Amino acid sequence: MPTTQQLLRKGRKVLQKKSKVPALKGSPFRRGVCTVVKTTTPKKPNSALRKIARVRLSSGFEVTAYIPGEGHNLQEHSVVLIRGGRVKDLPGVRYHIVRGSLDTQGVKDRNKSRSKYGTKKPKAGAAAAKK
């Protein structure tokens, strides 16, 4: 415990909070170009082929980002928008690609949680024709 005199002289040091998404540099989103698009397997006990992309950002960083949803149209040199948000069972993946913006298309035939996957509202006739 410091004395009152020591506190007057030095004061308390404020701890700096470490960013969980340093590559965004304080922005909500960043634009980037895909360098590699591949699949990887998650940690135990999960099993799947998760789609990920290595992205070179406008901030100069190169990060690994997750591609959410079923199916995607990304390939090398695709321009994508990145947001923060880790994937719990993929170590080192701390960013998500935003679906439905820039070169990334929205998820096809998605009806629920459409805004999260960049899917436009289906036409009234199209929904009736499917049934």
From Swiss-Prot:
Subunit structure: Part of the 30S ribosomal subunit. Contacts proteins S8 and S17. May interact with IF1 in the 30S initiation complex.
GO annotation, cellular component aspect: ribosome; small ribosomal subunit
UniProt KW DNA-binding keyword: no
Residue stretches of biased makeup (Basic residues): 9-20, 113-131
In-chain residues carrying the UniProt-annotated modification 3-methylthioaspartic acid: 89
Keywords, sorted A to Z: Methylation, Ribonucleoprotein, Ribosomal protein, RNA-binding, rRNA-binding, tRNA-binding
Species whose genome carries this gene: Deinococcus radiodurans (strain ATCC 13939 / DSM 20539 / JCM 16871 / CCUG 27074 / LMG 4051 / NBRC 15346 / NCIMB 9279 / VKM B-1422 / R1)
Presence of the UniProt keyword Transmembrane in the record: no
Taxonomy, superkingdom: Bacteria
GO molecular-function terms, A-Z: rRNA binding; structural constituent of ribosome; tRNA binding
PANTHER family per UniProt: 30S RIBOSOMAL PROTEIN S12 FAMILY MEMBER
Region of interest called Disordered, as start-end residue ranges on this chain: 1-22, 102-131
Name of the protein in its database record: Small ribosomal subunit protein uS12
NCBIfam families: rpsL_bact
